[in-house]
């Protein structure tokens, strides 16, 4: 895959289900879940002009039609989000020249949107990507990306974990086992956790 920096504007994803659900409710749910799945991935930072995610529901399951804010709706939402997340990660992993999947999760941001902006800025940073590729636990590049994410932060209130190893907190770098870090950065998937306090 190339030109993957979705804004639902060359990426195609198709999902089918047999549940009974109103088209308008399915469209609303898809729009909401696309923001936290497909619109969070990036390969090269270039947005294509024709991204698309499509969900088709034929109602053949025979269930009573799913209605918003019900137990069935919440279960379907959870399952659909799992499918969309899996597809989004598969597209990112398949990126031109991609050797690793970098996932960032931000907790403690004032809003979900702020958390998503910080996370997407981190995974889109060429300097973060090259550090992870080179197995270099350069927390400074991650902190830099957080800083230019458009969100106001105080570095003293930021904690960073790289591959589940704390590397930065309270405005200072932390000591860590370098051998363990190198081993974890060799993995094909690397997760960055950001905790804002």
Regions found by a protein language model. Name each.
Residues 1-197:
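A structural signal for small-residue-enriched, beta-sheet-centric alpha/beta enzyme cores
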């Amino acid at each position: 895959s190339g030109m993957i920096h979705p804004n639902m504007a060359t990426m195609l994803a198709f999902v089918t289900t047999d549940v009974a659900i109103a088209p308008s409710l399915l469209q609303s749910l898809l729009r909401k879940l696309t923001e936290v799945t497909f619109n969070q991935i990036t390969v090269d930072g270039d947005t294509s002009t024709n991204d698309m995610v499509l969900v088709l529901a034929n109602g053949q399951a025979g269930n009573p039609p799913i209605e918003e804010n019900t137990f069935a709706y919440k279960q379907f939402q959870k399952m659909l989000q799992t499918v969309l997340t899996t597809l989004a990660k598969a597209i990112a992993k398949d990126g031109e020249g991609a050797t690793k999947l970098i996932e960032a999760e931000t907790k403690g941001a004032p809003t979900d949107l702020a958390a998503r902006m910080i996370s997407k800025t981190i995974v889109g940073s060429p300097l973060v990507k090259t550090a992870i590729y080179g197995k270099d636990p350069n927390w400074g590049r991650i902190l830099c990306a957080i800083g230019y994410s458009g969100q106001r932060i105080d570095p003293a209130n930021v904690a960073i974990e790289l591959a589940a190893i704390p590397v930065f907190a309270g405005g200072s770098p932390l000591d860590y086992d370098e051998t363990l870090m190198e081993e974890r950065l060799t993995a094909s998937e690397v997760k960055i956790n950001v905790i804002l306090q």
